Amino acid sequence: APIVQGRAGVAVQEAYTLTGNNYYNPNWGYQDGKKRNARMTFDHKPMFMVSHYYKPDVKTEWNTSLFYTFGRDGSSGLNWFDAKDPRADYYRYLPSYYKNTDADLYAELQQQWRTNENARQIDWDQLYFANGKNLYSVENANGVAGNTVTGNRSKYILEEQRADPVRLGVNSVYSKQLDDSRHLTVGGSFNHQRTHYFKTVDDLLGGDFWLDIDQFADRDFNDTTISQNDLERPNKVVEQGDVFGWDYYINTRLLNAFGQYEKKWQRMEAYVGASLAQSSFWRVGNVRNGRFPDDSEGKGKANDFFNFGVKAGGIYKLTGRHFIAANAAYLSRPPATNVAYLSPRIRDAVISGLKSESVYSGDIGYVVRFPKVKGRATLYYSKIMNQVWSRSFYHDELLTIVNYNMTGVDQINRGLELGV
């Protein structure tokens, strides 16, 4: 079923302290006396599945499933151009920003935050007011010479960022009880997913249109061509429902095979398993971006990875109620597509030296089972190597969006778990 939710925002401790509310949410404000949330999520991804179950005898099973899913995954948010930041908790609007420079303003803002709810939420009416008095003419609009569009150019809009998936896959598992003490399972799967990343104008907030240009490139470069998000339609005028900003697909394909052998003895059970996988992912750009005109549109280079994994484990029965369990595994896996690309919204370029992650893991535990009480104590350890750490943020000194990536990141998780 479709899911629509309003999202809470993350604020700094100063905001929570001033409001006296640890659940303070900066994402909403009053419009015409009614609450409106700028951060809404929209999720609707139906799935269709066909399964076949084959059991030729009591010791054999062969199950196969074919599935298809598609849908919408969107999240709305405010965007603005040549205008003040509309977020009430923007750090320059907080009292602490003026603590050492303007004592009177510092005290006034503290009082406003404590007593005036409107001062700490989005001012929707002000956004509509700003958009309604910004008459602007776009010359050669949409790349058509002599085409002039005149109207109120929105300084603020509500946009929806989308990541709409289409996924098709098949899974097949064959299971055979070889005898009273041995069991074999083998299987394979194939998955293909294409995710469409783009954004649309959800609400012009009282304006007539939005001009589809990169505001950071527009500020940093004198060449207006560089600031065009769509070089095939320069000076693109967009209205409600139109796609703008970025528009591309990420395709992923995975072929996997696996097997597991299990053996039982009187006081012990053990298993070994292995898997092989071949994966590939690539980008397809739908627009030619002004920053990277030769590396943004069309099908990009495929990134291929071959991976494998092995595992083993067992249980030793000390008595009928006390057990020792141990497991160990090694596997390699391809990097996630959301961290593999440098700036997928505007170009087809992956991080230099991209390679598979390696995962080592193991655990050993003691298990006790009584009729009314069950308990477990487990020591675990895992090490993940060659990860990619990726973050995007606005840099105040550089006055631009920064894509920050680190490669070769290792991570260790270890600890003790107790459960009763």
Describe the predicted segments one by one.
Residues 1, 62-66, 184-188, 270-274, ...:
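Transmembrane beta-strands of outer-membrane beta-barrel proteins
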Residues 2-51, 74-159, 223-238:
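Acidic/polar loop-and-plug regions of large Gram-negative outer-membrane beta-barrel proteins
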Residues 2-23, 79-90, 94, 200-211, ...:
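Flexible, surface-exposed loop regions and adjacent strand-edge segments
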Residues 33-38, 47-51, 155-160, 173, ...:
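Extracellular loop and loop/strand-boundary signature of outer-membrane beta-barrel proteins
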Residues 48-54, 64, 170-176, 186, ...:
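Residues on the lipid-exposed face of transmembrane beta-strands in outer-membrane beta-barrel proteins
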Residues 68-72, 190-196, 265-267, 276-282, ...:
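Transmembrane beta-strands of outer-membrane beta-barrel pores
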Residues 157, 183-319:
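Signature of Gram-negative outer-membrane beta-barrel scaffolds
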Residues 167-171, 351-355, 361, 370, ...:
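Outer membrane beta-barrel strand-and-loop segments of large Gram-negative receptors
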